[in-house]
Swiss-Prot record:
Main localisation: cytoplasm
Record keywords, A-Z: Cytoplasm, Methyltransferase, S-adenosyl-L-methionine, Transferase, tRNA processing
Role according to the record: Specifically catalyzes the N1-methylation of pseudouridine at position 54 (Psi54) in tRNAs.
Organism listed in the record: Haloarcula marismortui (strain ATCC 43049 / DSM 3752 / JCM 8966 / VKM B-1809)
GO biological process, one term: tRNA methylation
Self-association state and partner proteins as the record states: Homodimer.
Protein name (record): tRNA (pseudouridine(54)-N(1))-methyltransferase
E.C. number: 2.1.1.257
Taxonomic lineage: Archaea, Methanobacteriati, Methanobacteriota, Stenosarchaea group, Halobacteria
Catalysed reactions, semicolon-separated: pseudouridine(54) in tRNA + S-adenosyl-L-methionine = N(1)-methylpseudouridine(54) in tRNA + S-adenosyl-L-homocysteine + H(+)
Residues annotated to bind S-adenosyl-L-methionine: L128
GO molecular function: S-adenosylmethionine-dependent methyltransferase activity; tRNA methyltransferase activity
A Pfam family reported for this protein in Swiss-Prot or TrEMBL: Methyltrn_RNA_2
Superkingdom field: Archaea
């Protein structure tokens, strides 16, 4: 299982946002939507062995489960509609018990620390950061949990949590990449057994 945890610092925590302004009034929700599509879509299929956790304002986590996912299309607007639907049902989520809001999409009342603690029990936590060790020097883990930030750097408290809980801190190359592009490169790294098998 491959997992991606993406922190959305400015992401909305209520469903009152316009699908027509994802890059503005919706707090750069467009970045998170592109991360979701990069994590799941192949040319003519969906990666079923992937799980994505979107941290919305350190208040809610929306999880996409590849094996159960339905109604996901490769455009930002339809992905944002799934997130908005999840937020519409946020009152149904009790504590850390998720509410399934559509097939393969659920919401929990949990921020970054709670989500990180949960995924760390089941996988190898890998922080993606431009100042990390080159990924080519790291053996591909069998159950990686890649943690990355949106268009902002990790906040100090997030960086401290990752310093304590991450098994690896890696860089995907000499240049800083967009979050969604980083997911594509991470997939390629795993698909090719560390860029060894094509």
């Amino acid at each position: 299982m491959r997992q991606f945890v993406i922190i959305g610092h400015d992401a909305p925590t209520t469903p009152e946002f316009s699908l027509d302004d994802l890059a503005g009034a919706a707090g750069r929700l467009d970045v998170l939507c592109r991360c979701v599509t990069s994590a799941f879509f192949l040319s003519h299929a969906i990666r079923e062995d992937v799980r994505v956790h979107l941290i919305l304002g350190d208040e809610y986590t929306v999880t996409f489960e590849g094996s159960d996912l339905r109604r996901l299309n490769p455009d930002e607007r339809s992905t944002a509609a799934l997130i908005r639907k999840a937020l519409e049902e946020r009152e149904e989520a009790i504590g850390h018990i998720p509410v399934e809001t559509s097939p393969g999409v659920s919401l929990t009342r949990r921020g970054f620390e709670g989500t990180l603690d949960d995924v760390a029990r089941r996988g190898t936590v890998v922080q993606l950061h431009e100042d990390g060790d080159p990924i080519v020097g790291v053996a591909p883990p069998s159950d990686p949990v890649f943690v990355l930030s949106d268009h902002h750097d990790f906040r100090d408290e997030e960086a401290a949590l990752l310093a304590d809980r991450a098994d690896e801190r890696v860089s995907l190359g000499p240049k800083a990449l967009h979050a969604d592009h980083s997911i594509t490169v991470a997939h390629n790294y795993l698909d090719t057994a560390g860029f060894e098998r094509y």
